[in-house]
Structures are given as structure tokens and as C-alpha cells.
Amino acid sequence: MFKLLTKTFAVPVVTGLVLTGLISGSVSAAEEEATVAFPDKFMLRLGAYIVDGADTQFSVSSDLGGLGTVLDYSRDLGGDSRDTIPRIDAYYRFNSRHRIDFTTFAVDRKGSRTLLLDPPIVIDGIDYAGGTINSQITYTLYKLGYAYSFYHSPKVELSITAGLNLTDYDLKFSDDTGAKVSQAGITAPLPMFGLRMGYAITPKWSVHYVAESFFIEFEDKLRGALINYELNTEYKLFKNFAIGAGLARIGSSLNVNDDEWKGSVSDSYRGYTMFGTLYF
């Protein structure tokens, strides 16, 4: 009889304790998630980067030696200064303090202009002075960063960031006939450090800002600088989907002096972003 009573009362009690534990755990997890802004573990953002102004200057070799003539891509070579390109951003959050970020986009610009410059322009041993030169510059960025949230409240997240910007330039030049073709390329991994801020105006509406910069000098072969500023706002239409828009500017300056290429590139892109964001 005692065993029967024990079994009769023990089963409901144990079941109740298990359910209570599960419910308490779920409530605690939900409360912990609700205590900080932007608790989502994974973010994927697909959007358009509307480049409203692109400024590019680079040096090429000349018959006079040295770094040669500095060309303004839009003014001297008729290069495009506006473009609309796809852009991808993502992050993975390990917990409320630590996350990794990823960004990539590519700007492909073309130009055509008759050169009337002195000294004559010689690229890869080919003289383009006095003729029509067709050009193409492709700028590709891959950015991988780490963010540490030193302040994370129900309204605000402040983070310091560190990472690597892999900057790739491909330059191509040719004449009207296609008989003269020159190509050059620069790939520079530039480290960067910065600050991120997120502010939840309401549970659905938020504002985000990021500022990053760095300068590096390696022996006499590479000298580079980087700046990146972004300001955007987004609104959550649903729990896992938001739309937004913002302002973005990125600039870099590279001076290269090695056996493969000697020259410099100064580049700046500014414009607007429009995007849709998935949260999980």
C-alpha cells in the first residue's frame, strides 16, 4: 500500500517539478533575451548601394620615370562617378557580448577619353598619349570583423570593432582598336578598428552607426589608410524581417612599391543604401 501511495503521489510531483523547471527555464531565457536590445543571433542583409559620388586618383609610370602622372579617373579618363550595386552584410552573435560581422560589395566603373597629357602616359610599357584610352576599374571589398559589446542595455548597444578589410583593385586599359591592352592589380589586406552604436527607438524602429579607420606602413613597400562611416535606420515589419535605408562612405589610400607594381591609388565612395534584413 505504501509503495502504491508513493508511486501515486510521486509521479504527479515529479511531473510537476519537471514542467515547472522547463517553464522557468523558458521564462528565464525569454527574460534574458528581453533585457538587451538586438538579441537576434544571426542577421543577413541584402541591399543596394547607390554610389552617388566616386573619386579615384591613381599614378601610372611615365617616360620621365618615378611614379608618373597622377590621373583623376572621372576628369582625365571619363570614368563613371555613379553606380548602383548589390551589397551583402551579415553577422553571427555568439552571445550578448561577442559577434562577428561580414560585408562585401564590388564597384565596376568604366571610362573612355582622348588623352592630351604631358608627360606622355605609359602603362605597362605601352604609350597611350594622344590617343583614345578605354578603361575599367573594379573595386572589390571583403570585410570580416569582430565586435565586442562593452555596453548592452535594453535600448543601446555600444561595441568596439577590429577586423580586416581585403581591398582588391583591378585596372584595365586599352585603345580603340584593342591592339594596346594593359592590366594592373592591387590586393591589400588593411586592418581596421572602430566603434559601433545601435539605438532602439522603439521595439521595431532602430538606428545604427559605425565609424572605422586605420593606417598601416610596411617597410617601404606598402602604405595605406582606410576610413569607413555608415549611418542607417531600419524598421521591423515582422519579427524576422526589417527594411531600412542609410548613408555610407568608404575611402582608402594605397601606395605600393614592389617588383610587380609601383604606384598609388586614392579612392572614395559615398552614397546611400536601401536594404531588407532577415533576423534569426
Model-predicted regions and their roles:
Residues 225-229:
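Charged helix-capping and loop-helix junction motifs
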Residues 206-219:
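Transmembrane beta-strand segments that form the barrel wall of outer-membrane beta-barrel proteins
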Residues 97-100, 154-156, 203-207, 239-243:
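Repeated loop/turn-to-beta-strand initiation elements of outer-membrane beta-barrel proteins
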